[in-house]
């Protein structure tokens, strides 16, 4: 792919999501900028405790392991490692078949044959995301869970969801590190520095920047105190319009992808509570892009133009894990209303 930055590392959670995929939420594991120099994992040893989740379709596996067991702590420390096969790079894929590739025949029948092909090192990298040290919350986050849909009224948000969120220790220091250029400054694709209506645009962890099919960037607003969709009012329209227009323009300039080939949306519930907007390739089924979580930014802007209190009053539907305490609280309120 032309005019793309080299693959770099970054830690956010993701989360995700969805992530819903390790999302930009995995950032909690560190704030250092990416580097092309040889690096080491931030721990020694890795003894697998449990496979938290795996997907043959997505070529990804989430592992819980014990590390640093040789440091004198007999119990070691917890870490989560996410291993993901990277997508093919179209401009390099022909190299897999030139010369004498290393092959192992699986079967042959008439015109059909299947092989295991062992690619050269530069075409066989595995994206590795590390969460270390990992807490019980991280282990639960990455473990496969059953989901349930729940409808949250405006009153539910004010009396249940918001107090619950405020009671949790949800650090977003990694977000401030990006905004303050303490981490990942070299990864910023575009910035509007206005403290009220500006933002930074940065590649999401789920995109390795080697092809456009799964393009994924995040716009993070400079203004602090806007937690989610629920906080938005007409006061924030200049910010939202800037993100939509300038974000699309920056992506067109850098990646030659036009606005009508982008899906631009917010999550609710978000994976972290500092306003951010997702930019993904329209043909990419990104985690969290389903109707129960994604809200198109253009529609959000129009809703606020029509009704200043739209997101304070509207009932919003989203999915929660069955073991999420917030689900129990909202279900109880729903039962009492019925």
Curated annotation (Swiss-Prot):
Gene encoding this polypeptide?
Dcps
The family this protein is said to belong to:
Belongs to the HIT family.
What are this entry's molecular-function GO terms?
5'-(N(7)-methyl 5'-triphosphoguanosine)-[mRNA] diphosphatase activity; identical protein binding; RNA 7-methylguanosine cap binding
Gene Ontology BP terms: deadenylation-dependent decapping of nuclear-transcribed mRNA; mRNA cis splicing, via spliceosome
According to the UniProt entry, what is the EC number of this protein?
3.6.1.59
Q: Return the protein name.
A: m7GpppX diphosphatase
Q: List-wise, which residues carry N6-acetyllysine?
A: 137, 141
In the record, which positions carry N-acetylalanine?
2
């Amino acid at each position: 792919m032309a005019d793309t930055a080299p693959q770099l590392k970054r830690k956010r959670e993701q989360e995700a999501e969805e992530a819903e995929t390790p999302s930009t939420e995995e950032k909690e594991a560190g704030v250092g900028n990416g580097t092309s120099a040889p690096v080491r994992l931030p721990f020694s040893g890795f003894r697998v405790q449990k496979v938290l989740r795996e997907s043959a379709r997505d070529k990804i596996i989430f592992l819980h392991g014990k590390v640093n067991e040789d440091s004198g702590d007999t119990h070691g420390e917890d870490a989560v490692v996410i291993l993901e096969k990277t997508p093919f790079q179209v401009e390099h894929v022909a190299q897999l078949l030139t010369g004498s590739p290393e092959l192992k025949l699986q079967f042959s029948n008439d015109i059909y044959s299947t092989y295991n092909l062992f690619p050269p090192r530069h075409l066989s990298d595995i994206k590795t995301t590390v969460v270390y040290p990992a807490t019980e919350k991280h282990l639960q986050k990455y473990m496969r869970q059953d989901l349930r849909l729940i409808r949250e009224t405006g009153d539910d948000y004010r009396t249940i969801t918001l107090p619950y969120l405020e009671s949790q220790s949800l650090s977003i220091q990694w977000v401030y590190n990006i905004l303050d250029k303490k981490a990942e400054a070299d990864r910023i694709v575009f910035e509007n520095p206005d403290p009220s209506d500006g933002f930074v645009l940065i590649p999401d962890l789920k995109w390795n920047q080697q092809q456009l099919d799964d393009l994924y960037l995040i716009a993070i607003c400079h203004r602090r105190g806007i937690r989610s969709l629920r906080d938005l009012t007409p006061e924030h329209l200049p910010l939202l319009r800037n993100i939509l227009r300038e974000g699309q323009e920056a992506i067109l300039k850098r990646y030659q992808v036009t606005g009508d080939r982008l899906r631009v949306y917010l999550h609710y519930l978000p994976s972290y509570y500092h306003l951010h907007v997702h930019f993904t390739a329209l043909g990419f089924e990104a985690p969290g892009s389903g109707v129960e979580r994604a809200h198109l930014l253009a529609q959000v802007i129009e809703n606020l133009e029509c009704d200043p209190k739209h997101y304070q009053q509207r009932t919003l539907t989203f999915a929660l894990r069955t073991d999420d305490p917030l689900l129990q609280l909202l279900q109880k309120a729903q039962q009492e209303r019925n």
